[in-house]
Amino acid sequence: MVLKIQRPSTGKKMTVKVQRKAIQMPYLPYYGMQKDGIGYINYNQYLENSAKDVRRAFIDLKKQGMKGLVLDLRNNGGGSVQEALQILNMFIPKGRHLLSMKGKVKNANSNYNTTVEPLDTVMPIVVLVNEATASASEITSGTLQDYDRAVIMGTRTYGKGLVQIPNVSLPYNGKLKLTTAKYYIPSGRCIQALRYKHTDNGYVAENVPDSLTHEFRTAAGRIVRDGGGIKPDIEVKPDSLPNIAFYLSRVDTTDIMLNYEIDYIAAHPTVASPKDFELSDADYEQFKQRVVKSGFTYDQVSEKILKELESLARFEGYYDDAKPEFEALRQKLKHNIAKDLDYPYNKQKIKELIAADLMAAYYFEKGSLENSLRNDKQFAEAARLLGNPTEYQKLLQPKKEK
């Protein structure tokens, strides 16, 4: 394949020959040692043979003096159950029950135990999860929770507790995803969040209400519940993305942020390492001026709420009396892009987004992930917890009943 390329920064035209071939993306986008002996492994998909890379990464980090591990399963939608079982074999003693699959017919039933001696049964572990952590990731995090082998931190997981056969061929090029069983982790719970109810209009999916969930116990006696995914031992919500940052990075069709980043790369052949890189205030000021001059606008949540309030006031008959106040508030909330970009929280989050993009360009996904840990609230809390052994161990013990 021959590509013709023109560099925006120089206007130079080039011809590049590209050889097409199958590319194997890394199973682990990034792993490495962080401050104070904390190891970090980012695992984004349970692909075939990926557990071997997790194993190698863990061994490497231990050789570097790791004192505690953060296993990041955020946004990991799962994959091969066998890979999940191999990872659990690394941390749970041989002969322990890991997983049961139960279907409506006997040949859909199966049980899985650990089959080899573990690599480590004492290393403190924090598993980071979120609402996009699903399937095999939930088997891993839920089983580690059931054996009190790790502290689960973040937000509640997706809740996919079904065993499915994908891509069953049907006539006329049809495909079917067939559910054959549910899976149950060691405490006996199924973490499936949706139940399917038969109605006159067919099957309807609905969330399992908390009142219908059941209580189970971990190996140490801690209370856990089924339904609704894996509830973390410590809930830590991520920082929210400001509206202006969302529009600049994901909605803006003029690509102001992307074009700024392209120009930045052209002007900076080399930059600091991902662990140290931060967009300077001077560089951010250049970006801000570019945004202001472009005429960029975005929808403010406060303006939307004001319109809804005005509509409600009209409906209730109060609008005419309050009209001057509404108009004054509208003027107060009027767009001031420069002011919005200078607001400290907005500025910080936009700088982080630009830095992550730049690190991906200079150092690929590995660099972007390493840089993002600098401002990752959930990772920071995980590292803090691993640095406090007494607090960590207390979380893995059952609460004293009053």
Indicate residue ranges for each PLM-predicted region.
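Short, solvent-exposed loop/turn elements at domain surfaces
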Residues: 25-27, 48-52, 186-187, 224-226, ...
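Short, intrinsically disordered/low-complexity patches at protein termini
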Residues: 38, 64, 105, 123, ...
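Stable alpha-helical elements in mature extracytoplasmic
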Residues: 50-57, 83-87, 94, 136-140, ...
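Conserved functional hotspot residues or short segments at active or partner-binding sites
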Residues: 190-402
